[in-house]
């Protein structure tokens, strides 16, 4: 990575405004999944060890520029203190006199969590005045929030106009792993693209067709491709306005010598429920009043075989409606194939794929799970991320 990281700068005694991604799911004031807090720990611990004064900023939920009591970062700060094993202070504002006083009282190695930056309307507008207020608290800006790197907000990008800007360790790892996958992948390189809609994955499919050896398609978006081949798909998800595009992608794959894998059989159902009756049919035999909801057993075997023979696999999007047990086997099988594959580097592109490997207890078997759903998708589309562009070059 050609961007400076916290390893490239002197941090001792410096006030560091570190943007992290503490946007964790909460229920009645309790954190239900602390993955994102844990992901930021190496950076925070490094800053503490180097003798920095660590000022942490994050958003939580979508308060839309006003104070929402249940979206305060107080429970997050408390949990962070437990995980770090040290006293973590919490400011009830993200800038201004109160925050400035608390920063002024900090010693080297102290940690302070600022209030939810999205309580201020200027955050999502990337307001220069707000960015200046954030910058006034610190000597150095560290961006470790890969999950918000695709947003040009005051605390992720704007602040870098007023302070030296470097990446944290998590951001650095994300950029290294995803960057290598796109620029210099180990081969065979396979991309698995799933999820509900073609329109969400157009950019990533288009970009990856130039890079990959194998492209595997699954999830709801597969049925648009199936229909493009002239098959009936019953009540399965389909974007009729994307059928021509699906044909174009299949033609492009052929021209570029990319092996294009689609379901050969599917799990179908007449209702969405945990007790639904399902059938397995060949891809060209979906009855008119049934809906495809998962890849079938033959498809799972084919996909597992491709995965096993790949050196690098990037996975973005589930193979079916994995939240419901009867329709979860395809997604689980892909996860299992990645977990079992020897000598295969697996990159899970955040979002639903990350949720799936967590759910099936396979997370620790994956080489890299991205902390950014939208950010990793945009990165894999070849887009520049505002939260990365703003960092100082080495």
Curated annotation (Swiss-Prot):
Molecular function per GO: ADP binding; ATP binding; phosphoglycerate kinase activity
Gene3D superfamilies membership: Phosphoglycerate kinase, N-terminal domain
Keywords, comma-separated and alphabetical: ATP-binding, Cytoplasm, Glycolysis, Kinase, Nucleotide-binding, Phosphoprotein, Transferase
UniProt catalytic activity: (2R)-3-phosphoglycerate + ATP = (2R)-3-phospho-glyceroyl phosphate + ADP
Positions carrying Phosphoserine: 183
Pathway assignment: Carbohydrate degradation; glycolysis; pyruvate from D-glyceraldehyde 3-phosphate: step 2/5
Subcellular location: Cytoplasm
Entry binding sites for ATP: 201, 292, 323, 350-353
InterPro entries linked: Phosphoglycerate_kinase, Phosphoglycerate_kinase_CS, Phosphoglycerate_kinase_N, Phosphoglycerate_kinase_sf
Entry GO terms, CC: cytosol
Binding site for substrate: 21-23, 36, 59-62, 118, 151
CDD domains according to UniProt: Phosphoglycerate_kinase
EC number, as in UniProt: 2.7.2.3
An individual GO BP term: glycolytic process
PTM sites of type Phosphothreonine: 299
Family to which this protein belongs: Belongs to the phosphoglycerate kinase family.
Subunit annotation: Monomer.
Name this protein carries in UniProt: Phosphoglycerate kinase
